[in-house]
Design a protein with these regions (language model features):
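Divalent metal-dependent phosphoesterase catalytic cores across multiple superfamilies
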Residues: 77-291, 295-320, 351-353, 359-363, ...
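Histidine-centered active-site/metal-ligand motif
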Residues: 170, 293-294, 378, 414-416
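Metal-dependent phosphoesterase/phosphodiesterase active-site architecture
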Residues: 14-19, 72-123, 128-134, 138-142, ...
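N-terminal secretory signal peptides
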Residues: 1-27, 43-45
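Residue-level detector of secondary-structure transition/capping positions
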Residues: 40-41, 191
């Protein structure tokens, strides 16, 4: 694809922000769209909920793809379609529900969904009983417009005769909830209101994080896509009954090449399919997404994330990196595009602000009650996969901080395989950690896991697989590091302990101990049929 005849060669020479500026200048010359493109709407706070206040987020974050002049104000509400063009609400069925924690998982939950066309007065109902969901709480509309001329249909189906593709994302961030409480909810709009559990597909539930130190399970993967195998890994996630799920980037592959170029193949309708695919799981299990290279979409905003800020309710609004805590574990999600040499479209876009924020988080994270620190992001600090190797930008900017502050576990994707390292410090393995080993991160270093086998086409290793039931220990594996200027620096490594070419997820169980005892974090790799391919136990003295 070329956008207004931008050549691929020109796109490769421009940063993502420069491409977006070029695109905005080009499209501003077009006569477009019902008097201007829709940006995003805002909301008012909802009524009191169970002794607190449940309110919807008021951040307007969707960016129109050609003109920001038509974004709506708080006083006027979302400007969607003329009333005469809005179909009957009863015929418009919400789909693609997914939830995520707010800034405080003990008291906040964001509920997001989609409608196929504009609706009037979208809302959520929430209560502690499926039979009593309470009053309506107004939801925020974030409308996203994509020019038909900027779409290369990935499945070769003409999206429509219209000049644009319109997508309507709805969000409500519930606040002042009670810790450790199960809530029930339904979503709707004028003409569509199904608040009773007799509508089995309409009423869903979620549970806020508890106060204190209780055992819990979470899951993780990266590089999912919209495939049969992606459905299988989602079902495997659901079978673990996790408190929440981490996604290490490359979510649905609507942006097909992942280069962050405005000439890349792109079909936003893939997002519709993705949200419909994950809804049976993500409507009740918080889906904590990080971004990868396939989330850089140059059409909506200078940083490429306008589309993501429309689709997802990030814990920190309009920011692709964030932190949260659950029980005795602190979690940090990073945007690897900011430091990446391999896919440089967004390299340096935060001007080192993210790395400074990371150090501040790590310096203060081990407060009373936090035993383990888990960091997740897309690119691999350490991997021997031949497709993408290791990312030098991560090693240069973030790994020294992981060493300095004693990060326990790092989870990545990007390479579509499973791989686990021995514990690493200062770029080298400190000791062997075979399957079933116990690792003390305080003395041995950080364990790195690549869990990128969530559903997209699988990648390959140069060495043989080695996993539970098929161990093949090999030393001296040839690999490479992506470095400055698109170069690849060869290296021979001994830290690759477990390698598995197949679809998989991570299951991680936290078992806190009383103060002075030994807390454990059991890390297990599970293949698509649920069988175990890897297991180690990380230990820390409980604070």
């Amino acid at each position: 694809m070329t956008s207004e005849r931008m050549t691929p060669e020109l796109a490769q020479r421009l940063s993502l922000a420069e491409q977006h500026d070029w695109f905005r200048r080009a499209t501003s010359r077009r006569a477009l769209l019902r008097g201007g493109l829709v940006g995003a709407g805002t909301l008012a706070a909802g009524p009191a909920l169970l002794g607190g206040t449940a309110s919807a987020s008021t951040t307007a974050s969707a960016t129109a793809s050609a003109s920001a002049s038509a974004s709506t104000s708080a006083s006027s509400g979302p400007a969607l379609l003329p009333a005469s063009d809005i179909p009957s609400g009863s015929s418009v069925v919400p789909f693609g529900r997914h939830i995520a924690y707010g800034a405080d998982p003990t008291t906040q939950m964001a509920v997001s969904w989609q409608v196929p066309t504009a609706v009037k007065n979208p809302f959520i109902r929430v209560g502690t009983s499926p039979w009593d969901l309470g009053e309506r709480i107004e939801a925020e509309v974030r409308a996203l417009t994509t020019l038909r001329t900027d779409v290369v249909s990935i499945d070769n189906v003409d999206p429509s005769a219209s000049s644009t593709i319109e997508q309507y994302y709805l969000h409500a961030t519930l606040k002042n909830l009670k810790p450790g409480e199960t809530y029930y909810y339904s979503v709707g709009h004028n003409g569509f209101d199904r608040p009773k559990p007799s509508f089995a597909t309409s009423v869903k539930s979620f549970t806020t994080a508890p106060h204190g130190r209780e055992p819990f399970t979470f899951t993780a993967f990266g590089d999912q896509g919209v495939t049969y195998d992606a459905v299988a890994t989602e079902n495997l996630v659901a079978a673990q009954q996790p408190a929440f799920h981490l996604v290490a980037g490359d979510i649905c592959y609507a942006e097909a090449s992942g280069s962050g170029l405005i000439t890349d193949p792109y079909d936003p309708r893939i997002w519709d399919a993705y949200f419909a695919q994950i809804a049976p799981v993500a409507a009740e299990i918080p889906w904590q997404v990080g971004v990868g290279n396939h989330e850089m979409e140059a059409w909506y905003s200078p940083d490429g994330y306008g589309g993501q800020f429309s689709r997802f309710a990030f814990p920190t609004p309009n920011t692709t990196y964030f932190a949260f805590s659950y029980g005795n574990v602190a979690f940090i999600s990073l945007d690897g595009n900011d430091v990446c040499y391999e896919m440089p479209a967004n390299r340096g876009f935060t001007a080192d602000a993210q790395t400074a924020w990371l150090e501040k988080q790590l310096a203060g994270v081990r407060t009373a009650g936090i035993d383990f620190v888990v960091v997740y992001f897309h690119y691999c600090a350490y991997s021997t996969c031949v497709n993408n190797g290791s990312e030098g930008g991560v090693r240069e900017q973030w790994v020294p901080l992981f060493d300095k502050y004693g990060v326990d576990l790092v989870i990545s994707g990007h390479n579509h395989i499973y791989e686990r390292t021995d514990p690493i410090r200062s770029g080298a393995a400190t000791s062997a950690a075979p399957i079933g080993a116990t690792v003390d991160p305080a003395t041995q270093g950080t364990t790195y896991v690549v869990a990128g086998g969530a559903g997209e086409n699988l990648h390959k290793f140069s060495a043989a697989d080695s996993y539970e039931g098929g161990v093949d220990n090999i030393s001296g594996i040839s690999s490479y590091i992506n470095s400055a200027g698109g170069t690849k620096v060869d290296e021979t490594v001994s830290w690759s302990r477990v390698r598995y070419t197949g679809y998989c997820i991570l299951r991680i169980d936290s078992k806190p101990a009383s103060r002075g005892g030994t807390s454990t974090l059991t890390v297990r790799g599970l293949k698509e049929d649920g069988g175990e391919i890897d297991r180690i136990v990380l230990t820390r003295r409980a604070g």
